[in-house]
């Protein structure tokens, strides 16, 4: 079963299934390592869930909730 990345709390590990965007934002996410099959750890979620601190490929990255919502993931 898949969900959007913005629905997860700290401590979850998920795998990217699909990214639902295109253009500049898609290139930005791909450049940061957000590619299908990559594993993401949700490290911390700020108040109101915005932004989220994520760990991907041993890098810590913060994404806005609106950006995280575009990433479809599955729990691993």
Region spans (language model):
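C-terminal structural segments of small proteins and small subunits
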Residues: 48-76
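Short, structured beta-strand/loop micro-motifs enriched in basic residues and often containing a Trp
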Residues: 12-26
């Amino acid at each position: 079963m898949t969900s959007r990345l913005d629905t997860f709390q700290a401590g979850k590990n998920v795998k990217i299934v699909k990214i639902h965007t295109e253009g500049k934002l898609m290139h930005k996410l791909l450049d940061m390592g957000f590619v299908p099959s990559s594993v993401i750890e949700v490290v911390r979620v700020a108040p109101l869930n915005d932004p989220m601190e994520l760990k991907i490929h041993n890098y810590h990255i913060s994404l806005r909730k609106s950006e995280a919502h575009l990433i479809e993931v599955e729990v691993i």
